[in-house]
């Protein structure tokens, strides 16, 4: 049963890695990076800012909180801004919720591993796959939100004011993508472990099949 133990251990480590990566991503401020190039075309950078889920920072310091999308729900704003606020609210709920689900899944995975229960392993594997899908949905919504926010800024201030602006996604988003991949991998490993354990419990299965 060495292979089964390896699968279970790998799944547990993958879940822990997924939690650590997503926690670091959610807490950091390098999701969205904005640079304003020199208007004279010299290639210099006049302004550099980076944003996270909770605040935006100019340079290395001077961070200010982002507008609370929940407190802003009743404001009289345009439909496009209301849509942006709703996307921001969704991201701020989905990604922290994914963290909680990873912890719950890790506990369920530990219990199913100790009990050597095929149904529990299957359920936990599917749980992690669904959790990975939720994280993926949150990341996709954030990317859409960032794009629409830039479009709204261009519409509000004029295209000429944003033509020297360069935007990109930072390492925080990369950590979140890695967390999503690790979570899905953990789910796949648990499903493989459930399959292996199911085969080993069948009567008449040669011992070499389960080693």
Curated annotation (Swiss-Prot):
The chain crosses the membrane at residues 91-111, 118-138, 173-193. It comes from Mus musculus (Mouse). Keywords: Endoplasmic reticulum, Glycoprotein, Membrane, Signal, Transmembrane, Transmembrane helix. It is a multi-pass membrane protein. It comes from the Eukaryota. This is Transmembrane protein 235. N-glycosylated. Its main location: membrane. The lineage of its organism: Eukaryota, Metazoa, Chordata, Craniata, Vertebrata. It is found in: Membrane; Endoplasmic reticulum. Residues 1-28 form the signal peptide. GO terms for cellular component: apical plasma membrane; cytoplasm; endoplasmic reticulum. The keyword Transmembrane applies. Belongs to the PMP-22/EMP/MP20 family.
């Amino acid at each position: 049963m060495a292979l089964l133990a390896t699968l279970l251990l790998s799944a547990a480590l993958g879940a822990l890695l997924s939690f650590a990566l997503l926690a670091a991503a959610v807490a950091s401020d390098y999701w969205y990076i904005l640079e304003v190039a020199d208007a004279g075309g010299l290639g210099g950078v006049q302004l550099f800012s980076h944003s996270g889920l909770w605040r935006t920072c100019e340079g290395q310091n001077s961070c200010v909180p982002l507008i609370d999308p929940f407190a802003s729900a009743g404001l009289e704003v345009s439909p496009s801004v209301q849509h942006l606020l709703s996307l921001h609210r969704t991201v701020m709920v989905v990604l922290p919720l994914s963290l909680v689900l990873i912890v719950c899944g890790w506990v369920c995975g530990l219990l199913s591993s100790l009990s050597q229960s095929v149904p529990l392993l299957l359920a936990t594997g599917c749980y992690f796959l669904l959790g990975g899908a939720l994280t993926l949905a949150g990341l996709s919504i954030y990317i859409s939100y960032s794009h629409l926010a830039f479009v709204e800024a261009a519409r509000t201030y004029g295209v000429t004011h944003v033509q020297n602006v360069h935007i990109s996604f930072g390492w925080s988003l990369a950590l979140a993508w890695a967390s999503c991949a690790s979570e899905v991998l953990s789910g796949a490993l648990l499903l493989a472990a459930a399959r292996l354990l199911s085969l080993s419990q069948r009567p008449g299965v040669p011992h070499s099949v389960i080693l």
